[in-house]
Every structure is written in structure tokens, then in C-alpha cells.
Amino acid sequence: IGKSVPLVDANWKMTGQAQYGDDIRLPGELIGKILRSPHHYAKIKSIDTSIAEAMDGVFAVATGQDSVNKFGVLPVTKDEHAMAQETVRHVGDLVACVCAIDEATAIDAMNSILVEYEVLESIHDMEDGLKDSEHPIHDRGKYHIGESNVQKRVFQQFGDLDSMAAAPYSHEADWETAGLHHGFTEPHAVVAHWDPSGRVTVWSP
């Protein structure tokens, strides 16, 4: 505390020597690619993967129906899926994935998947998203409060809140800020290896 600490991996990153998941190459590896939604909000009417499945060099094709188990980025709320089940909720939502012998084959297979959508009215204004809705974008689970499109509200409490009453100054206000992605240097990729004993090694990002 109170001292400048050298960033131990700065030189590796600045000189391009840092190793990320996408730099890892394993013997006999397979390449996966993900098909993503071009729509903000839509129902998935059908997915035809037959062309991709019949292609030489394609080992597997999967959709949301193959990944029905739920998880939670916030572990207390396990209400998310690895891929869209019946509805896509943003541009880039995961629809299907392929596993192939190389990247070119995986991309060709991914692009051959035919998806029929029913495009729904999307919300692009925060104030509109807070209004009550008969048809919420997200399923209403036990953490969904009220009738709005707020996906979930989780209340957590930290510190001594009572001490704020004795604070000499206080300020309350509303703030708005745009979504901001961190300035990453690594590609979004992951490499996994299962050895004969069943041990899994994962390189990410």
C-alpha cells in the first residue's frame, strides 16, 4: 500500500510474447465456432443443422436444445443457458455451435446452419425497459420483481450502513453511463484438453 508495484507481465504483453488461449495449439485439436443472432429480440422458429452435420470434417453440431441445464454468472440466480433455448435476446446471442477438424471447415459449417426467426419488437431505451410489460424479454423467475423488463434484482448488503446516518456529508443522485468494455489485449478464445485419466486442462482467455 502506498507504493508503485511493477506489472510483472507488462513486457510480455507489450512485445507480443504473452501466451493466450488462442496461441495454444494441441496435437489433434478440433476447432469450435459459434453461430450468433443477428437480431436484437426474436423467437427461434426452427434451426436446420443438416447441411453442417453432413459436411466432411465436422464432428459435432449443437443448439440450445443440447444445453438445457441452467447456470448463473451470479451464482445465486441460476437462470441462464449456454445457448438460446427458444428466444434470442440481443444481437450476438448464442444460437448454435459446431466442432470441426480446422477453422475453415468450422466457419463453413457454421454459415451453413439455417435459422428461421420471428423478429419481435425490441427495446432500445432504458426508461422504456423499466416500464411494466405483459411480454417480458426475460422469463420471470423468483428474482424478477414487478412487471418490468428488469431481468432480476438481487439485494446484497456490505459494511456498516447505520454509520452513514452519522456522516457529516451525504449526497443522493441518479447517474447514467454507457456500457463500457475493458480494453483487453487477448482474443476471446478458450482451449480445453482432456487427458486419458479424465483430467481437464483449460487455457483462457
Task: State what each model feature region is.
Residues 1-205:
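Structural alpha/beta core scaffold segments of enzyme domains
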